[in-house]
């Protein structure tokens, strides 16, 4: 039945999206920790200055989320990047990731151009939207056709590199 297939697809998409989000956060933290010019605080100050609505959104999150203690504490003391990535939404994190990448010569079109579509499908899966039903719906924004690039990127993820079933999961 279509609804069962759709539920299974959403479950897989969400699992993959959470892994991608985690991998991006770990990768960004690794790059920042190796960058002697970055202390972890200046980046967040610059990010908040460029996107002034984000600190306001985080303050609002302090009143109705699981991360209220961290948001309240960091709002008073000042955010370091390792604190900020724990409370930013995926969309906000994408903005931070792109900002750091662009300003530190780490811009990668293959990754950065896929972040918004990845966020969109992640949100659709997380909000239990019917995904199979919309596969043929024409969208005004062009969809990326980067199958080889995605496969190459995924093949470099250590946890998936060792997996014998990676090829079948990508097929």
Task: State each model region's role.
Residues 32, 138-139:
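Single-residue recognition of alpha-helix boundary sites
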């Amino acid at each position: 039945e279509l609804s069962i297939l759709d539920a299974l697809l959403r479950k897989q998409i969400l699992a993959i999206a959470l892994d991608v989000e985690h991998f991006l956060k770990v990768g960004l933290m690794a790059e920042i920790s190796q960058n002697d010019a970055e202390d972890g605080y200046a980046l967040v100050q610059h990010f908040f200055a460029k996107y002034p609505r984000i600190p306001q959104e985080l303050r609002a999150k302090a009143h109705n989320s699981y991360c209220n203690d961290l948001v309240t504490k960091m709002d008073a003391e000042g955010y370091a990047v390792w604190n900020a990535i724990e409370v930013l939404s995926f969309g906000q994190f994408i903005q931070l990731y792109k900002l750091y990448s662009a300003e530190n010569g780490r811009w990668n079109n293959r990754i950065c151009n896929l972040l918004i579509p990845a966020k969109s499908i992640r949100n659709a899966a997380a909000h239990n939207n019917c995904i199979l039903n919309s596969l043929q719906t024409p969208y005004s924004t062009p969809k990326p056709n980067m199958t080889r690039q995605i496969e190459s990127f995924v093949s470099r993820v250590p946890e998936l590199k060792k997996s014998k079933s990676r090829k079948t999961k990508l097929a």
